[in-house]
Amino acid sequence: MKKFYSVILWGICIAAAVGLLLLLGSLMSSTSVKAEKPVIYLYPEQEQEVSVRLDYDGDLTCTYPEYKDGWTVTAKPDGRLTDRTGTEYNYLYWEGTSDWEYDFSEGFCVAGEDSAQFLEEALAKLGLTRREANEFIVYWLPRLEANAYNLISFQTEAYTEHAGLVIEPKPDTVIRVFMAYQPTDSRQEIPEQELDAPARTGFTVVEWGGCEADPG
């Protein structure tokens, strides 16, 4: 009988250990946040070769054109890019996963149904052209409108410190717009974020992207 109870106890211990490992695995995987569709536009003053390298504190999951050790393209003032095979692109695209935290100390609480108007106004303040803003909105609008409300914060150092851009030749103006959002069922109070952008002068680089952040 003693041996029987020992076997049962041993089985319980194994089951508990397995359950704990599964729980820990679930918690660890839930902290991974995906940076979705950051795209990079290059606008030199004259046609020239440009190299772009990512210094990303995470794992790249998709790039187009293929990233390899970086991108090297011929960029034109209107933003058209051509690689060494002659293939033309509108922008450089990448996605990645990371486990760093985003800053929601300031931002906006926006009703899902008001997302389009909010983005049009916010992206203009952040320096995107109408074409760039349109591409941002058509990608993110369906996700934002699906929620009752969204806490939205445009990331600054919390993003750029973990996702650096190394560009040669060095651009005169860099505009990086990265939107982190958290769905919520009700309106939340949050200090309003001030939005601005540098003037576009000389060789200008623009990047936009976003993610649904873990509410933590």
Question: For each of these PLM feature ranges, what is it?
Answer:
Residues 1-15:
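N-terminal Sec-pathway targeting helices
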